[in-house]
């Protein structure tokens, strides 16, 4: 069985053992080379004591356990680790007498392998037993939920709750204790999320059962079908959440899974990065196939956003930019076909494509901001209108028709909000973690909405049923909480300056029309509608401004933005009051002037908020420099001294490996992971940037580790070097962690800081696991067990890829965080210069 350490307890026990085993492997190699001079007895005795203590604890657990599977699984693991300790003791004795003893060397390696594998198996047996206990608690709660479907009187509801509470409490307790133990942060977050769902649904379940009881008691009442739907919906939600808890409890993978989603979902951050990489490549004259393919993907994204644009004008701009860029690419391909890919004309077209690609990216940001400004201006309006329709007087002749219309509008509104959130998640340039959270929130909103209309219909059919009204209110509040939470997340991703500009233009247009209506003494209801629209949009400006203020740790900016927002907030109510006064006295010129003046103050307030944000704005990408006209490209300056020539021979070899064409990934996945990080870092100048230097060191060492993993230096040397290189990479990872934390602590942008810190949280666990897995791999090399060696390799490959992927993300997140560093911070001197470029920075998304 592969070595597992998916909990912190397992990792804390296996790590020191792995260090001792690693030392034993080094002694084995010394023995193979005839260089062993040390007596192994003290080290072997230390390992033996650890084995004895662990076996004693395990034996006592077997005696007291009622888990028959545990009793059957544990003894073989105990025997394996005890036998391994005997092998080590024999090896120490044999090698002390004769350092060339073949039997001693064999037993040393077999014992080292047996100790780490046996301990892992033993600990896993105990962990599986604990998980089975947790699953049993969860299953008991899950099974008891079915009782809720047959409750028809409130007395039975009381009994149900009395019986459910102990099991539910136990389940929550064991899950709360488990999730902090997991080394896989994604799994820990899943458990927390599903436990939150359970907590959220319990009061809704109680309310839904109570509605069913009262509808059943009331003879001849209608709405039973909808009431039962609401109850069963909540039961199903709870069942699914508990099933997911059970699934995650049984997972033992230690690596982060790739996010899976719809179009663009799996690489929201990669998409933004692709835009920037393609711009830089085109600006430097690179029109290779990979560059043009990346540009075409960007064009496809622009057209996808265009199809979902809020207005025809925005759609037309996006499509025009995409079409123009597509035409430039066709011209470039024609030049390449004629062998003129390096001509002045091709360079001019490449530069034009870079500029047009930047325009397309900007139009996408504008389109997203415009759609959010359109769809989120009145989030709670439709559900409140639906509630009012359900509560309408039974004597209202249009009651049923009005309810049907409001229900239809609510469902369309929910779909629109969720669609917009998903669009922002896939195209907003946010981190993949933020994109995944947005998609979850959108799915949650859609899910909750399925219970809203049935709950409202029960109220419609049972006007006097207070329990039905309470249930509708509960469901409505849950929907509003979900929608508002999703709205805040969306506001945190979109380009807030573009949002302010869109909102300001719309408010100006509405105010202009409202003033015209007031002065022309036209339909008063039109005036109220325009004034209400202005008020809602102004309040949205305040909401987005608050998100920006909450995100910043710059006290001066926060103070200015808060002051401007407060002034705007104070101007909204007077404008609405004056609009109502105009309706009351439509011919009063003085009142008309007061309304116009108050409306202008709202416009001024919005402009002031926009101005504060604009003054503090860091553009995502500054304009590309103008292409200098020249007949022939200038001669390249003499190359600087190659940094690789200053490296030790081993690192020079790694540098050459990383710069050489890559073999197929399936032939050498660790090398591929190292090369990916190296090329990400190699875009940046190392001068003045210790983080980039450190990352390139890690990539070189990972490339060498891939060589040692494959045994390319000879079996004896590879084992020692594999363990040594893993330890060095782990030390580099700790240095990277320290340096990047300095950047995070100095960053005044909370979103950028949080994104970076979340990535850094992964590094300690991954780097510790790397040392353990390298040791496991070393013990399996040449051991004669092909299956064990393959398992060890797979685990090491997965860890290496995970570490390199995290390091690559840390580079991007650190560069983004450096855009808003405190000027007085020591780390503020860090420089981010693109090689051969203008030092353009990739801004964090707002």
From Swiss-Prot:
Keywords: Actin-binding, Cell projection, Coiled coil, Cytoplasm, Cytoskeleton
Residues covered by region (Disordered): 617-646
GO terms of molecular function: actin filament binding
Tissue specificity comment: Expressed in epithelial tissues, specifically the pinacoderm (outer epithelium) and choanoderm (feeding epithelium) (at protein level). Also detected in migratory cells of the mesohyl (at protein level).
GO biological process: cell adhesion
Pfam families: Vinculin (PF01044)
InterPro entries assigned: Alpha-catenin/vinculin-like_sf, Vinculin, Vinculin/catenin
Coiled-coil residues: 315-370
Entry similarity comment: Belongs to the vinculin/alpha-catenin family.
Protein name per the record: Vinculin
Gene name tied to this protein: VIN1
């Amino acid at each position: 069985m592969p070595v597992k350490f998916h909990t912190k307890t397992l990792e804390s026990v296996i790590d020191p053992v792995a260090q001792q085993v690693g030392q034993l492997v080094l002694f084995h190699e010394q023995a193979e080379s005839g260089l062993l001079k040390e007596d192994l007895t003290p080290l072997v005795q230390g390992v033996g004591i650890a084995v004895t203590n662990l076996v004693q604890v395990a034996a006592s657990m077997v005696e007291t356990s009622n888990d028959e599977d545990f009793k059957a699984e544990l003894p073989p693991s105990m025997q394996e680790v005890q036998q391994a300790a005997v092998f080590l003791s024999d090896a120490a004795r044999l090698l002390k007498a004769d350092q060339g003893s073949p039997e001693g060397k064999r037993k040393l390696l077999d014992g080292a392998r047996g100790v780490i594998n046996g301990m892992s198996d033993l600990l896993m047996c105990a962990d599986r037993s604990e998980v089975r206990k947790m699953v049993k608690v969860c299953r008991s709660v899950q099974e008891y939920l079915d009782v809720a479907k047959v409750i028809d009187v409130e007395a039975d509801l009381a009994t149900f709750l009395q019986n459910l509470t102990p099991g539910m409490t136990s389940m929550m307790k064991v899950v709360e204790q488990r999730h902090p133990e997991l080394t896989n942060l994604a799994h820990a977050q899943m458990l927390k999320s599903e436990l939150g769902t359970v907590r959220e649904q319990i009061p809704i379940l109680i309310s839904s059962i109570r509605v069913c009881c009262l509808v059943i008691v009331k003879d001849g009442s209608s709405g039973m079908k909808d009431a039962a739907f609401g109850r069963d919906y909540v039961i199903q939600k709870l069942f699914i959440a508990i099933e997911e808890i059970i699934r995650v409890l049984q997972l033992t993978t230690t690596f982060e899974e790739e996010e899976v989603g719809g179009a663009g979902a799996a690489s929201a951050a990669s998409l933004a990065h692709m835009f920037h990489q393609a711009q830089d490549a085109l600006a430097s004259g690179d029109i290779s196939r990979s560059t043009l393919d990346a540009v075409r993907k960007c064009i496809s994204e622009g057209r996808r956003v265009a199809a979902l644009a809020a207005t025809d004008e925005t759609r037309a701009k996006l499509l025009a930019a995409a079409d123009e860029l597509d035409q430039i690419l066709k011209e470039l391909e024609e030049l390449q076909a004629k062998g003129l890919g390096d001509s002045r004309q091709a360079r001019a077209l490449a530069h034009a494509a870079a500029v047009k690609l930047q325009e397309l990216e900007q139009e996408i940001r504008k389109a997203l901001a415009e759609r959010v400004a359109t769809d989120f201006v009145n989030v709670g309006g439709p559900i409140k209108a639906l509630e009012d329709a359900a509560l309408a007087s039974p004597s209202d002749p249009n009651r049923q028709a009005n309810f049907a219309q409001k229900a239809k509008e609510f469902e369309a509104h929910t779909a629109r909000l969720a669609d917009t959130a998903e669009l922002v998640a896939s195209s907003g340039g946010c981190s993949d973690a933020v994109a995944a959270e947005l998609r979850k929130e959108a799915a949650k909103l859609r899910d909750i909405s399925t219970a809203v209309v049935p709950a409202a219909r029960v109220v419609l059919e049972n006007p006097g049923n207070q329990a039905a009204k309470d249930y509708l209110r509960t469901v409505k509040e849950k929907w509003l909480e979900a929608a508002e939470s999703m709205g805040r997340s969306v506001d945190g991703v979109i380009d807030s300056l573009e949002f302010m500009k869109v909102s300001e233009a719309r408010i100006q247009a509405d105010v202009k029309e409202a003033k015209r209506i007031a002065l022309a003494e036209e339909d008063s209801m039109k005036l109220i509608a325009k004034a209400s629209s202005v008020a809602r949009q102004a309040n949205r400006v305040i909401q987005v401004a608050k998100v920006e203020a909450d995100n910043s740790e710059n006290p001066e900016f926060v103070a200015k933005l808060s002051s401007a927002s407060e002034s705007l907030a104070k101007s909204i109510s007077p404008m609405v009051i004056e609009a109502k006064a105009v309706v009351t006295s439509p011919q009063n010129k003085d009142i008309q002037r007061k309304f116009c003046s108050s409306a202008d103050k709202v416009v001024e307030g919005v402009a002031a908020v926009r101005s504060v944000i604009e003054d503090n704005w860091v553009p995502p990408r500054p304009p590309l420099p103008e292409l200098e006209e020249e007949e022939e490209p200038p001669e390249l300056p003499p190359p600087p001294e190659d940094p690789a020539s200053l490296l030790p021979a081993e690192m020079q070899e790694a540098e050459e490996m990383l710069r050489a064409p890559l073999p197929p990934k399936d032939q050498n996945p660790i090398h591929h992971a190292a090369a990916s990080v190296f090329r990400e870092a190699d875009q940046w100048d190392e001068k003045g940037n210790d983080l980039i230097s450190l990352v390139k060191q890690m990539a070189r060492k990972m490339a060498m580790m891939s060589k040692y993993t494959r045994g390319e230096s000879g079996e004896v040397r590879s084992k020692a070097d594999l363990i040594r290189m893993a330890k060095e990479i782990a030390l580099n990872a700790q240095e990277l962690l320290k340096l990047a934390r300095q950047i995070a602590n100095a960053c005044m942008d909370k979103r950028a800081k949080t994104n970076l810190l979340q990535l850094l949280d992964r590094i300690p666990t991954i780097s510790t696991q790397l040392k353990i897995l390298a040791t496991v791999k070393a013990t399996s090399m040449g051991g004669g067990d092909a299956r064990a060696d393959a398992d060890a390799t797979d685990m090491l490959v997965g860890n290496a890829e995970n570490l390199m992927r995290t390091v690559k993300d840390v580079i991007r997140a650190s560069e983004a965080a450096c855009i808003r560093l405190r000027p007085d911070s020591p780390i503020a001197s860090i420089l981010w210069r693109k090689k051969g470029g203008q030092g353009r920075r990739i801004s964090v998304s707002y």
